[in-house]
Amino acid sequence: MKTTFKNIIRTIALTGSIVAVTSCPVYSAEYVSVTKDGVNVRTGPSTSNPVYMELFEGYPLKVVDKKGDWFKVTDFENDSGWVYSPLLEKRDNVIVNANSRANMRSGPSTGNAVVATLERGVVLELLERQGKWVEVRHASGTQGWIYAPLVWP
């Protein structure tokens, strides 16, 4: 009887552990973009916290924490702060993260023609990933391919 009771308790404890583990939130990298120009990044999750920097529409960010309606975010230079979440949305944008400039090409290879040269910090709409290349479109409408390690994320 004692052995059966111990087995039941052990089974309940194990089942509870499995439920507890599977119900824990799993955080994978979540990327968002700023919805309009002039969005403030603050030092804490409240409008009473000082503004750390101001961002423009489309700027991509990585969500690293959440507190109420606020997201703690980091950017491609690893600067971090808090943004009011309604000012962010899921959007496939990337930012040029090259040391100086990146060539946008007509196809996914260095053998293709350069269609534009982009400065560090230029935001682009991500259209497709193909191996180590990404197809992107600039707000001006210029479209092409960039070597993926030269953009973030």
Task: Please describe what each predicted stretch is.
Residues T11-S23:
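Bacterial N-terminal signal peptides
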Residues C24-T43, M53-E57, V64-D79, V83-S106, ...:
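SH3-family beta-barrel domains
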Residues K2-A13:
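Bacterial N-terminal signal peptides that target proteins for export
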Residues M1, V21, P25-V26:
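Short, contiguous, well-ordered secondary-structure segments
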Residues T47-S48, T110-G111:
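Short, small/polar residue-rich loop motifs at catalytic or cofactor-binding pockets
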